[in-house]
């Protein structure tokens, strides 16, 4: 069986990766404050490029290996890594990176359906791991990833970068402080204008000689059902296909849901979920919906998510924006995004942070935001610090599993077409139409095909 053999845009099929295989290469101790952290980058596409560049900016981090299945991507990022470290190596097989005893931390920026295999193998090899969001493509994968991190006592930071943003941290403290009163509804939304052609309709290609320049397509597909080559199923657009990802909900939605749940209490889990939507506007070949509304019911609040890929205008009473989180409370409302946050009081008041109370106001001014670039830098700083200290990162793997799983069950409810009862402790659906419950539970624990096994 093929186990922990992830590819992405980067890596190849290898034998089972178990902890006992790596006893001879495990790091002997937590890295000291002055030691260089040596990184291996697996998957160096769009997100992988950004993560590589951010690592290269730090004087205490050295890229020593890059890995990708796409020949052009690999060559470009190898040259980039060599601009800082001439001895950096290039690989198609990601296990060569993980088995390299000189690699301290693995940066996993693969397509979503390879996150689990890469992360589990890296944890079992004793490496620190930075894994892009979403953590997984199924709830079952997330469970296995959390288990691998725990059994190896591994530092794992996930790519939910908003946790490192000052405006998000401040806004969360405001919500937790009670100044909004009782929050009964948290709305999240992610919008963009791509109508109607979107990602386009490139043809499937069945002749390997014609698609071979992109790399080993069969290896890239790995454990999922194999399909004819289509350029949209690789490269930048993989996330719009349910084979490899979860659409906008697991792409942008996981960022928003993560912050919403952090503010409302991470120990609180939804008890039911429903979703509606479809592919109504777009004429491209995506398989994920272009319009989606999801509703999760918690014991004492409702969380909702809206996605439309055919309009960038948010139809709410606050500043128009293309993404955000809105906390609706009995004493006020807080709107939060990467652009900043704004408190909108009831009864024409504003919040005085020094007095920690509402007061009359003439106009409400927004708190300015920390830019995206700073979010990534602060997030990496936290990861590096935790590698040295052994402390739990701000986007620790348990938190990202929770937020990713909540998104997965939203997609499951959409595909099953029913409102479903969720048991957060068991992480399975326990109520709803029998056929829908069965379909949804199968979706969140999809089996590995083509000879692959998980963990």
Region spans (language model):
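N-terminal Rossmann-fold NAD(P) dinucleotide-binding loop
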Residues: 48-49, 115
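Beta-strand-loop-alpha-helix segment that lines the small-molecule cofactor/substrate pocket
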Residues: 111-112, 116-164, 178
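N-terminal export signals
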Residues: 1-24
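Glycine-rich Rossmann-fold phosphate-binding loop(s) that bind the pyrophosphate
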Residues: 44-45
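A short, basic/flexible loop-to-alpha-helix module at the beginning of a structural domain
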Residues: 20-35
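NAD(P)-binding Rossmann-fold cofactor-contacting core
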Residues: 61-81
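N-terminal Rossmann-like NAD(P) cofactor-binding module of classical short-chain dehydrogenase/reductase
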Residues: 105-107
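Contiguous beta-strand/loop segments that form the cofactor/metal-binding neighborhood of enzyme cores
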Residues: 169-170, 182, 187-398, 402-455
